[in-house]
Amino acid sequence: MDLVIKTLDGHEAGKLKVSESIFDLVPREDILQRVVRWQLARRQQGTHQSQGRSDVSRTGAKMFKQKGTGRARHSSARAPQFRGGGKAHGPVFRSHAHDLPKKIRALGLRLALSAKLKAKDLIVVDELAVKDAKTKKLVSHFSKLGFNNALLIGGQEIDINFFRAASNIPNIDVLPIQGINVYDILRRSKLVLSKAAVEALEERFR
């Protein structure tokens, strides 16, 4: 299948042949959900922790004698039912990350690309580069291409002027091809790929 290549000015600059195994798959929401959940779980810090009964600073002495008081039996004042005691089954410092097979991750990326193309939310440009780092000029380019909320994926290296100009625009993310991921693709309305990015994806999934 062929994709139309556009310039930043919105003009056509030819066509690019792409593989149907990357850009024309049947949508699978279950796979996309698994990959997004895996990404967000890896990102979650997990630094929350409460003090258990072994962590609180209270005496370890028995509260009162075992028998003869008529009261319920108690030992440590650190028990969760007492004021100043430890938290029962509270959160602990841990990693929320879980495993996901590489094949599922790769399939998820191809499904995300296919979903954007089927929704007509995929734009291919010849290159992501500008002469001057002028945000106002770049905004006009984006309006000509028809988007104001997008993820832009360049080649191995991002043009520094383009990156600086785009960094001031809200709802616009710019990443090199190494950083492409399912979550960022789905969270933005449009996906903009440079010609170099498409070629890198073709090489990656060959």
Curated annotation (Swiss-Prot):
Taxonomic superkingdom: Bacteria
Subunit field text: Part of the 50S ribosomal subunit.
GO terms for biological process, alphabetical: translation
Region (Disordered): 42-94
Entry keywords, A to Z: Ribonucleoprotein, Ribosomal protein, RNA-binding, rRNA-binding
Organism encoding this protein: Bartonella tribocorum (strain CIP 105476 / IBS 506)
Gene responsible for this protein: rplD
Function (record text): One of the primary rRNA binding proteins, this protein initially binds near the 5'-end of the 23S rRNA. It is important during the early stages of 50S assembly. It makes multiple contacts with different domains of the 23S rRNA in the assembled 50S subunit and ribosome. Forms part of the polypeptide exit tunnel.
Stored Pfam families: Ribosomal_L4
Family from the record: Belongs to the universal ribosomal protein uL4 family.
Biased composition (Basic residues): 64-76
GO molecular function, one term: structural constituent of ribosome
Entries under InterPro entries matching the protein: Ribosomal_uL4, Ribosomal_uL4-like, Ribosomal_uL4_dom_sf
Polar residues biased stretches: 42-54
Annotated protein name in UniProt: Large ribosomal subunit protein uL4
Keyword DNA repair belongs to the record: no
Keyword Membrane among record annotations: no
Any one of the GO CC terms: ribonucleoprotein complex
Matching PANTHER family: 50S RIBOSOMAL PROTEIN L4, LARGE RIBOSOMAL SUBUNIT PROTEIN UL4M
